[in-house]
Amino acid sequence: MRTIDKRIAPNVRLAATLVARAPALTLAYDARCKSRLAATLDTGEDVALVLPRGTVLRDGDVLVADDGALVRVAAAHEAVLLVRAPDALTLTRAAYHLGNRHTPVEVGAGCLKLEYDPALADMLTRLGATVERASAPFQPEAGAYGGGHRHGHDATFAEDYALAQQVFDEHHGHSHSHSHDHDHDHDHDHDHDHQHGPSCSHGHHHGHR
């Protein structure tokens, strides 16, 4: 069994014909978040995926097997929810509440896409959004700073929040003063693979005493 253990950096240009000839590894989002995986190429060949921990594969990524051969990643069709709204405010509220639940979201033009979840579908409907179940590739937003799960007590989250607030102030002419006081006397162990994108701006306030 071949082992796939390298991902070519997205900024490395490869000949289109070379990539097109490479066999595809078609995976749903959950599988693309796993760095250790037994998988099957579209050709029927079984392979072992062994990538650095924390790697999240995206549609179009190119991988390298231990024999030097290339493998291209394809996002599989999976059960998703397509969320639309009659106005921008309702769609923004939907994005806010999804962000509060750390839900991975793919942002489209006038539409949000997320993994199928009947509880979330009910919540979004109550908010006034139109929710449609569909089968489609799912590729949620990546973090603005390249990270994954964000919390209010993370330094990178503070940067994201400050940037979002700056943009808001520039557009609305407001000046807001925010004070964050976080006193942590206990450890947190968060193991989340999903990611939030910059287009889904939301605030998280964690006050631990």
From Swiss-Prot:
<dbReference type="GO" id="GO:0019627">
    <property type="term" value="P:urea metabolic process"/>
</dbReference>
<dbReference type="InterPro" id="IPR012406">
    <property type="entry name" value="UreE"/>
</dbReference>
<dbReference type="InterPro" id="IPR004029">
    <property type="entry name" value="UreE_N"/>
</dbReference>
<feature type="region of interest" description="Disordered">
    <location>
        <begin position="170"/>
        <end position="209"/>
    </location>
</feature>
<protein>
    <recommendedName>
        <fullName>Urease accessory protein UreE</fullName>
    </recommendedName>
</protein>
<dbReference type="Pfam" id="PF05194">
    <property type="entry name" value="UreE_C"/>
</dbReference>
<dbReference type="GO" id="GO:0051082">
    <property type="term" value="F:unfolded protein binding"/>
</dbReference>
<comment type="similarity">
    <text>Belongs to the UreE family.</text>
</comment>
<keyword id="KW-0996">Nickel insertion</keyword>
<keyword id="KW-0143">Chaperone</keyword>
<dbReference type="InterPro" id="IPR036118">
    <property type="entry name" value="UreE_N_sf"/>
</dbReference>
<dbReference type="InterPro" id="IPR007864">
    <property type="entry name" value="UreE_C_dom"/>
</dbReference>
<dbReference type="GO" id="GO:0005737">
    <property type="term" value="C:cytoplasm"/>
</dbReference>
<comment type="function">
    <text>Involved in urease metallocenter assembly. Binds nickel. Probably functions as a nickel donor during metallocenter assembly.</text>
</comment>
<dbReference type="GO" id="GO:0016151">
    <property type="term" value="F:nickel cation binding"/>
</dbReference>
<dbReference type="GO" id="GO:0065003">
    <property type="term" value="P:protein-containing complex assembly"/>
</dbReference>
<keyword id="KW-0533">Nickel</keyword>
<keyword id="KW-0963">Cytoplasm</keyword>
<feature type="compositionally biased region" description="Basic and acidic residues">
    <location>
        <begin position="170"/>
        <end position="196"/>
    </location>
</feature>
<dbReference type="GO" id="GO:0006457">
    <property type="term" value="P:protein folding"/>
</dbReference>
<dbReference type="Pfam" id="PF02814">
    <property type="entry name" value="UreE_N"/>
</dbReference>
